[in-house]
Design a protein with these regions (language model features):
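Short, charged recognition helix plus adjacent turn
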Residues: 1-7, 73-92
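A short, Lys/Arg-rich alpha-helix, primarily the initiator
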Residues: 1-26
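Residue-level signal for the short linker/turn that defines the boundary of a DNA-recognition helix
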Residues: 15, 26, 38, 53-56
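Conserved hydrophobic/aromatic packing and binding residues within compact polymer-binding modules
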Residues: 17, 31-32, 43-46, 72
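Residues within the helices of the helix-turn-helix
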Residues: 18, 29, 59
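The alpha-helix within a helix-turn-helix
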Residues: 21, 32-33, 62
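Recognition helix of helix-turn-helix/homeodomain-like DNA-binding domains
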Residues: 36-53
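Short, basic-rich loop-to-helix N-cap that marks the start of a DNA-contacting helix
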Residues: 49-63
Length: 92
């Protein structure tokens, strides 16, 4: 099997996290408390697109927001190669 390539769009993922927080009525403080963080800096970095949550935190975030990790991540033009065929997928 050939490798698959993708690019996570960090800033757009941050905007998606912020949008989902607003839609679900959560604040940064709510996420901070749910994650058990002493301060909200990590959450602010996520929504500003300066960093991404760890996999563990993505799982917690997806449960908090009642959605999947795939619905939180914004990915740009996957190139998927299977059995010698190439497919170009646009996921947003």
């Amino acid at each position: 099997m050939e490798p698959m390539y993708l690019q996570v769009l960090q800033k757009e993922t941050g905007r998606q996290i912020k949008k989902l927080l607003v839609e679900n009525g959560y604040t940064v403080k709510d996420v901070q408390n749910a994650m058990g963080f002493e301060n909200p800096q990590a959450v602010y970095k996520w929504i500003s697109g300066r960093s991404l949550p760890s996999l563990d935190n993505f799982v917690i975030l997806s449960r908090l927001l009642h959605t999947s990790i795939e619905d939180i991540l914004v990915i740009d033009e996957d190139i998927v190669r299977l059995w010698g065929f190439s497919f170009k997928l646009i996921v947003q």
